């Protein structure tokens, strides 16, 4: 069943306040910086590097290991496993629509996709390489990569870490999911949502979720690249969910900035494709989407949402699932026999 919103509700939905500019569709393409325009050659190279486990110390972990683009762009683990079976401290966020974030990582420590791509290879838990020089040396020792770098960046000394990061970022900018039922609604098709999804949209606005989750990506307002949108979590530390799900054990952005004022501050995540990205929260402690809605209502809004409200909001979140871009595994250049010695 599809539902046409009554005019009174439409007026409320598009009224002043946080919801005024809220209902925006996801753009059909992701923005790219002036120094890294997206090209087919960069995307092809970036996809290869994204899938290549040889960028890790053990030759066993790739970007794809934690951000599975064949499904929801994450790994469905509370926290991810890296080299030598080590476990990270935070939930792997989805890579889908990451291109619409103005900063990257839960704590916003990377100002761009290009800089984010340089982080995991040298994280001692994730991919375990000693430094970025070691990463690019590993790539240079795979001769089959050089023609792809030259196609993407021209002749000369182009097999560099900066170019590798640019290529990965270019590929990630193709990982977007416009065209959801919600996007059709936001473009003017008021019959695109079911009755329950329409109620969920209204509840989402009425209870205050849009104070954080606004904009086309439902991750906050559009900001200049490198300027992140952060919110305190939990806002109401007396919520019983704080202890139940250990929500304050991680200092959040303060771990990156070393500023005590940033304790408990987190980059606001996207709500798109949530049905594909369980478990939830920065520590992956909440297993189901209805429970995540209850947790956020309590910790952020000091509200105990009814079962009906939770069900309607979850239905609305289902309308944020867009068609995923088709993905295939790339063929990688052959491995020299001494590469992983």
Residue ranges with predicted function:
Residues 125-126, 152:
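Class I S-adenosyl-L-methionine-dependent methyltransferase module
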Residues 22-119, 183-294, 301-303, 328-341:
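Short glycine/threonine-rich turn/loop motifs
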Residues 129:
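Glycine-rich, positively charged N-terminal anion/phosphate-binding segment
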